[in-house]
Amino acid sequence: MFGICNLSSIPVRKNGDDKSEMISQLLYGDLYEVIEKKEKWVLIKINFDDYKGWIDYKQFSEIESENHFNELIKNKAYSLDLINFVETYNKELIPIFLGSNIGGSEYIKHTFDGEFSNKIRNRRQLIETAKLYLNAPYLWGGKTPFGIDCSGLSQMVYKINGYKIPRDAKDQVNFGADLGFIEESKEGDLAFFDNDEGEIIHVGILLKNNFIIHAS
């Protein structure tokens, strides 16, 4: 079974339980594969980053077939407004956040009339995207301007600008090239932070003059 997020956002939990921590979010248009169903919960694997977690079955919206799913995967287009909306077939409005994938909106009979990107963008545009998240509150597992965590910020900024990186900082560090010195870095590069044991625990995006935008 396959699904698509047809809501503004859906919490993805560590376990199939209302009290379980939120480890990530589905945003509007995100695609996923169903791995298991348990009572009122569905274990999913998010298509973009293979992240696994549980969502409430009430929020599950099924895609008819694997063929439809594979077609939708090819049709990525990310909204560029801090917040916008899609209109349903019966003229209701659903708010959507920056970085929502509106590429599948027609499939679920929704219309969208806003700015979007479906290509790789340059560093200047990447930095402009990052600055849209300034003053967003910190939220563990969050991926929206209304609540976001450090690796959610880096993943969303890169995603909107056409780059695919993992969900968690400890995995993001393995992508790209290591730089020996800060002087070698450019705006838009990722800066990682470790603890006393050498484990990556935080990530931010480099700006000019070695400033960093991050969520904490």
Predicted regions and their residues:
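Boundary regions of SH3-family modules and the immediately adjacent low-complexity/disordered segments
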Residues: 1, 24, 28-31, 39, ...
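Short, conserved secondary-structure segments in the cores of folded domains
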Residues: 22, 92, 178-181
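...with weaker cross-activation on analogous glycine-rich loops/strands in unrelated enzymes
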Residues: 163-216
